[in-house]
């Protein structure tokens, strides 16, 4: 059993200043200083969901992050413009300077247009291991994108239909990181329908769809992949054309994957509860729920009382072991080679053409339980895609100025159907945080203790 422990020595020193030029306008600048010291390698909870800031191969590292954000509105208050950047430097055995985020956004009413690289808003104080989204956490450094979206749009204003609101986004990513297929693109669209069942209860359902498309493969059998010419085939989930690889012609164009979304929100004056279920698919069998056992389930609870000892709780479970079954186009009877069974072995987040998998800057875009294999500085996909994981987290306040949280996760890794582990590998991870805010200064100190136990992350 591997054991790894780490202590964040200086934690996070955060200095921020906010000033307003008009009621709707503001500028915010903050500086964060981090020092991480580990006995072996950086533990799971300190490394993940940090937008790729932490280098897990450096037991000792220091970082400085500069955060800048500006909000302005036009004189008529018709548009609101946000823009900002997060720049970082890392000092250690390997030092680096990087631009983590850089973005601009213009909003009008319920609609917005965003351009640049920007992380997702932190949900439930970071207690969720996926930031509440199985496919889009804050685990990886974001690539730049152009995104058109809506938040809380109400298409109907009368009768029962006024209870319906819609969230959506349509985005195209420019993949600037090094990967097996260079100059590839990533398409993303998501729509969520919210139905207010009562004053306190809202049900939602939606669809989340991702596609890797285009690019140049180093494989001589594939080479340059069709680009914008086949754009509608990619975004509509159609089969490839005559210029596509044979596998795309037989199936669908590009690397297509996504999830069906379901949830229930309950909000009272005293508390808020959310139940959520996210069901992943990689092909038609998954979309039709042939892999019903697989998915991501969670519940979050938060007291709305100001600064109680225990304020929030999140419990989540993930399973990806079914993958629509162990057979894919398998002939059980050698005498009947055309009698094939099975549409399984989905091998989530890996792909035969886009070998780097569902990653951004060599980190899983979604659930950090999935850890890519890195060879010569490039992700070659995920060695284990059949995983079960359970995690829980809690937070609250010891006083008005002292915040605390605790997290724990246990996961089992079974490899792939094509390459199963002789015995499952496992990982237990835990972290606790204490943050103290200065009484009269915009400064806070954060101390984190974290540990890993298990054999999965041995290097």
Where are these regions (language model features)?
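Transmembrane beta-strands of outer-membrane beta-barrel pores
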Residues: 33-41, 70-72, 87-91, 108-110, ...
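Outer membrane beta-barrel
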Residues: 80-177, 195-213
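Feature captures outer-membrane beta-barrel proteins of Gram-negative bacteria and organelles
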Residues: 64-72, 99-117, 144-151, 189-196, ...
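Transmembrane beta-strand segments of Gram-negative outer membrane beta-barrel proteins
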Residues: 21-64, 74-85, 166-168, 447
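Short sequence motifs at beta-strands and strand-loop junctions characteristic
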Residues: 56-60, 93-96, 138-142, 183-185, ...
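Short loop/turn motifs that connect adjacent beta-strands in outer-membrane beta-barrel proteins
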Residues: 21-28, 70-82, 94, 107-110, ...
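Bacterial Sec-dependent N-terminal signal peptides
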Residues: 1-26
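Outer-membrane beta-barrel pore domains
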Residues: 248-459
């Amino acid at each position: 059993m591997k054991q790894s422990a780490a202590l964040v020595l200086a934690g996070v020193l955060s200095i921020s200043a906010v000033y307003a030029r008009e009621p709707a306008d503001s500028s915010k600048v903050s500086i964060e200083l981090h020092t991480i010291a580990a006995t072996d390698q950086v533990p799971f909870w300190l490394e993940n969901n940090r937008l790729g800031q932490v280098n897990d191969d450096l037991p000792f590292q220091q970082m400085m992050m500069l955060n800048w954000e500006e909000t302005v509105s036009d004189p008529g208050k018709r548009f609101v413009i946000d823009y900002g950047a997060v720049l970082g430097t890392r000092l250690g055995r390997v030092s680096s300077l990087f631009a983590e985020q850089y973005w601009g956004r213009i909003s009008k009413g319920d609609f917005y247009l965003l351009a640049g690289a920007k992380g997702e808003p932190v949900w439930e104080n970071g207690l969720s291991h996926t930031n509440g989204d199985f496919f889009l956490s804050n685990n990886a450094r974001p690539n730049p994108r152009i995104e058109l979206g809506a938040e809380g749009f109400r298409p109907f204003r009368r009768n029962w239909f006024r209870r319906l609101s819609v969230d959506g986004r349509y985005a195209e990513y420019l993949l600037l990181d090094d990967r097996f297929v260079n100059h590839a693109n990533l398409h993303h669209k998501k729509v969520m329908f919210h139905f207010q069942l009562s004053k306190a209860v809202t049900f939602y359902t939606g669809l989340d769809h991702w596609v890797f498309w285009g690019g140049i493969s180093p494989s001589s059998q594939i080479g340059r992949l069709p680009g914008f010419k086949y754009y509608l085939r990619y975004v509509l989930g159609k089969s490839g054309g005559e210029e596509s690889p044979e596998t795309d012609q037989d199936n669908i164009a590009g690397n297509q994957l996504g999830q069906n979304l379901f949830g229930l929100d309950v909000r009272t004056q005293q508390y808020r509860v959310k139940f959520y279920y996210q069901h992943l698919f990689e092909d038609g069998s998954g979309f039709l729920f042939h892999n019903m056992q697989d998915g991501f389930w969670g519940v979050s609870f938060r007291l709305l009382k100001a600064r109680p000892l225990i304020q929030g709780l999140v419990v989540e479970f993930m399973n990806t072991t079914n993958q629509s079954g162990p057979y894919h186009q398998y002939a059980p009877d050698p005498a009947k080679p055309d009698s094939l069974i099975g549409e399984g072995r989905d091998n989530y987040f890996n792909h035969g053409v886009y070998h780097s998998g569902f990653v951004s800057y060599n980190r899983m875009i979604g659930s950090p339980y999935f850890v890519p294999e890195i060879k010569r500085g490039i992700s070659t996909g995920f060695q284990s895609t059949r995983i079960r994981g359970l995690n829980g987290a809690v937070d609250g306040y010891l006083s008005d100025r002292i915040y605390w949280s605790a997290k724990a996760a246990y996961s089992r890794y079974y490899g792939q159907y094509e390459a199963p582990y002789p015995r499952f590998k496992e990982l237990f991870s835990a972290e606790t945080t204490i943050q103290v805010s200065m009484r009269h200064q915009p400064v806070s100190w954060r101390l984190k203790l974290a540990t890993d136990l298990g054999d999965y992350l041995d290097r």
